[in-house]
Design a protein with these regions (language model features):
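Cytosolic/stromal cytosol-facing helical appendages immediately following the last transmembrane segment
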Residues: 63-162
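Non-catalytic, topology-defining segments of multipass membrane proteins
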Residues: 1-71, 75-103
């Protein structure tokens, strides 16, 4: 629950702060950028998130940082959906940083945040289910090599030694 609170507070702080909010790329009228941008922003957001998350996650696995940031999440060696957002507060701050990146790099509508967060929660819960929804052999397909599946993530939790 603390993680979700941090995920809500940090973007709101940047948006609502009188000295910071006016400098964000947040917009309120879809007509300002049009429907093409509204829908086209999502692939960009997911690509930005994947890049950000990959490097942040690798950094948190560094031996000098792991115990401070990421150990709490890895205490779940056979993760369940409840582990999806079981983070140390410092890790939660790092994870929510992508929302701050969005706020200062691309035009972003409040619905972008809502839809992106909803889809992220769904995929993160799936990633911690411990059972697979993709077909057998998917990990050998070219696309499967680029997608972190639930089983792959479960093995990451089970076999990683910090």
């Amino acid at each position: 629950m603390l993680t979700i609170t941090i995920f809500a507070f940090v973007p709101l702080f940047f948006i609502k702060h009188p000295a910071i909010g006016p400098h964000t790329t947040l917009y309120k009228n879809i007509s300002d950028f049009g429907w093409a941008w509204f829908w086209g922003a999502f692939p960009i957001m997911f690509l930005m998130h994947d890049t950000y998350f990959y490097w942040a996650h690798r950094l948190m696995h560094h031996p000098k940082l792991f115990r401070l940031f990421h150990l709490v999440h890895h205490l779940s060696t056979n993760p369940s959906p409840w582990a999806a957002y079981a983070f140390h507060p410092l890790e939660a701050i790092i994870e929510v940083g992508i929302f701050v990146v969005f706020l200062f790099t691309i035009p972003i509508h409040p619905l972008h945040f809502f839809i992106f967060f909803l889809l992220s929660v769904i995929y993160n819960v799936y990633g911690h289910l411990g059972w697979e929804i993709y077909p057998k052999g998917f990990s050998r397909h070219w696309l499967g090599k680029w997608i972190n599946t639930s089983v792959n993530h479960n093995q990451h939790h089970q076999f990683f030694k910090g």
